[in-house]
Curated annotation (Swiss-Prot):
GO cellular component labels: cytosolic large ribosomal subunit
Function: Forms part of the ribosomal stalk which helps the ribosome interact with GTP-bound translation factors. Is thus essential for accurate translation.
Protein's GO biological process: translation
Family matches, as InterPro entries: Ribosomal_bL12, Ribosomal_bL12_C, Ribosomal_bL12_C/ClpS-like, Ribosomal_bL12_oligo, Ribosomal_bL12_oligo_N_sf
Region (Disordered): 107-126
Alphabetic keyword roster: Ribonucleoprotein, Ribosomal protein
GO molecular function ontology, one term from the record: structural constituent of ribosome
Similarity comment: family membership: Belongs to the bacterial ribosomal protein bL12 family.
Protein's name in the database: Large ribosomal subunit protein bL12
Gene assigned in the entry: rplL
Keyword Ribosomal protein part of the UniProt annotation: yes
Chain intervals with Basic and acidic residues compositional bias: 107-116
Keyword Ribonucleoprotein recorded: yes
Length: 126
């Protein structure tokens, strides 16, 4: 049996049409019981790595999801966290769900979340 170099094989493949190459790949997969789509699994794993990097982010948005029963305490907490005036803080609380802080450091976001939850609000970090 004649042995072909990679260059010779590439030259032969270069002369084939896409239909001929597709048929060749199918025949190759059947003969050697393999799948040409295997590298796709490696590509699918890449987003998982991206998700892990996303979990390690250092900036968070503090979202006021719901006010709860203690609206006045929540307004006071929003004023303390954001240094907003009374009217602005009330408008923010009345417009929930809204961002109280955006792109805050993790420790600041956790502190704000804790203060708002103590006041009776429902808060999430994004």
């Amino acid at each position: 049996m004649a042995k072909y170099t990679n260059d010779e094989l590439l030259e032969a493949f270069g002369e084939m049409t896409l239909v001929e190459l597709s048929e060749f790949v199918k025949a190759f997969e059947e003969k050697f019981d393999v799948e040409a789509a295997a590298p796709v699994a490696a590509v699918a794993a890449a987003p998982a790595a991206g998700a892990a990097a996303e979990e390690e982010k250092d900036e968070f948005d503090v979202i006021l999801s719901a006010v709860g029963d203690k609206k006045i305490q929540v307004i006071k907490a929003v004023r303390a966290i954001t240094n907003l005036g009374l009217a602005e803080a009330k408008a923010l609380v009345d417009g929930a769900p809204k961002a109280v802080l955006e792109k805050a450091k993790k420790e600041d976001a956790e502190k704000a979340k804790s203060q708002l939850e103590e006041a009776g609000a429902t808060v999430e970090l994004k």
